Amino acid sequence: MDLSRSQTNFQLGFGCSHASMTPTPTPRAPIADDSINLQVDQSFRSLPTTFSPIPLQLLEQKAEKTTTVDEPKKDGGGGGDQKEDEHFRILGHHMCLKRQRDCPLLLTQSKHPKRSSIGDSDLESRRAAVRAWGDQPIHLADPDIHELMEKEKQRQVRGIELIASENFVCRAVMEALGSHLTNKYSEGMPGARYYTGNQYIDQIENLCIERALTAFGLESDKWGVNVQPYSCTSANFAVYTGLLLPGERIMGLDSPSGGHMSHGYCTPGGKKISAASIFFESFPYKVNPQTGYIDYDKLEDKALDYRPKILICGGSSYPRDWDFARVRQIADKCGAVLMCDMAHISGLVATKECSNPFDHCDIVTSTTHKGLRGPRGGIIFYRRGPKIRKQGHHSSHCDTSTHYDLEEKINFAVFPSLQGGPHNNHIAALAIALKQVATPEYKAYIQQMKKNAQALAAALLRRKCRLVTGGTDNHLLLWDLTPMGLTGKVYEKVCEMCHITLNKTAIFGDNGTISPGGVRIGTPAMTTRGCIESDFETMADFLIKAAQITSALQREHGKSHKEFVKSLCTNKDIAELRNRVEAFALQYEMPASLIRIE
């Protein structure tokens, strides 16, 4: 290449004037002040040349490859070296590149013209691999978990479920729980989310709220509801957090008397068990040890002395109806907000099969499973609108407002104070369950559940068993085992080996001491499977037989709990009773054939 002409034909100039760089001024079009310009000498076009001027192009677009092969030497000394040169033109000059350009992309494209299709194939392969990773059924994705799930399925099918807080959900609820709604994050309340894309989630939650009010016969201008709590314990703590400062007072039914731990339970030794008792000051009221009923007179005396800011009614192991009107009077006298935890009786409340806490309470909380047959979760109802001042009300906590201010406080406590995003699959499942609560079929179910509990209580009483309060008004009963010399701990273990599930519970003894001397028995789950009064008569026989086996084993092994448990696996009486229980249970289908009997 002749480089002698390049300095006259091709020059670089700057927007600023530099006379030394351009001996012969030539016209050029300025681009911008103080910017670099490409300056071409006008005389270039008139110079004779064998090449026609061509526009500047990318090297790979105009590269012309020529191959020169050295002739083999006549002495036969091996093959000639193959050399590959590249020739191209730029600004009319013929140029030859002797050294191979380091351009892997260019060489790859020239040697592999179908590279793009190969790349697309690789991308599709990677996409398919990712999709396949998340598209396996449980038995392939995780055989270990699948095996355990199958075992739990068989346990439910082949056993008698008498735990009062358990039930079997319907098919539609199960489908919603396992749906795509679990994918969406939706922190906040409907219409005020922290994430976008929640227009349909908002509609689902609003529909759930509407159905919750309808299920319990409530007017939206008088009651509001939050359906986001993860559990009733979470719902209860949200109420405390929203309405109280740390260290302020709450008062609920003592746990051994039938209350729930989330109502502020402390052990007799003073150990704080519940977060409610850790962050707030709690003081319990109790049942009458002779009758097992709540002593409302003593409750009033204690409340007037203690002056709680929140008075809690409701429990988890109380078999009798509540006098909500009397508790309302007590709350008014001591100036407390009245809250009811109706977790165990919510189905009875919805169908008007027990006294109604909404007639008297300011706040009502509940689980969403148990009698409601919904998903596991919590719910909070709260009053809104103008307050109705009752005669004899004492405002000891400086409450002079004329309207309820519970809504904003409770909603803020649920989110962002205590929870993050709600479980949208749970809210949809709850909406389905609440729709069913408003049907005549559900009312018939609750009525049968209550009849079954009374039939079971009567059957045990005829067999000389002692029941706390002598019976039941709802879905559960408490069997005091102490007259038989048994504790709930050993008895529930024998029942479990016989495929009967129930739970031990503390009994408030006649002498004022607390011992886990009883068991709690409930009828919701087996009523769901189709059992009626006569079936619970049969179950009473199973329970009595299990108690007899427990007494015999306890006499044989004395106080050695280790030997007692060891003997359960080889006991012939247990094996015989287990076979009878399984044969009985297999007669009844699980709801909507969710779990097939095999």
Swiss-Prot record:
Catalytic activity: (6R)-5,10-methylene-5,6,7,8-tetrahydrofolate + glycine + H2O = (6S)-5,6,7,8-tetrahydrofolate + L-serine
Residue span of region Disordered: 57-85
Keywords, comma-separated and alphabetical: Cytoplasm, One-carbon metabolism, Pyridoxal phosphate, Transferase
Pathway in which this enzyme or protein is active: One-carbon metabolism; tetrahydrofolate interconversion
Cofactor(s) recorded in Swiss-Prot or TrEMBL: pyridoxal 5'-phosphate
GO biological process: glycine biosynthetic process from serine; response to cadmium ion; S-adenosylmethionine metabolic process; sulfate ion homeostasis; tetrahydrofolate interconversion
Complex and partners: Homotetramer.
Family to which the UniProt record says this protein belongs: Belongs to the SHMT family.
Described function: Catalyzes the interconversion of serine and glycine.
Protein name: Serine hydroxymethyltransferase 7
Organism this protein belongs to: Arabidopsis thaliana (Mouse-ear cress)
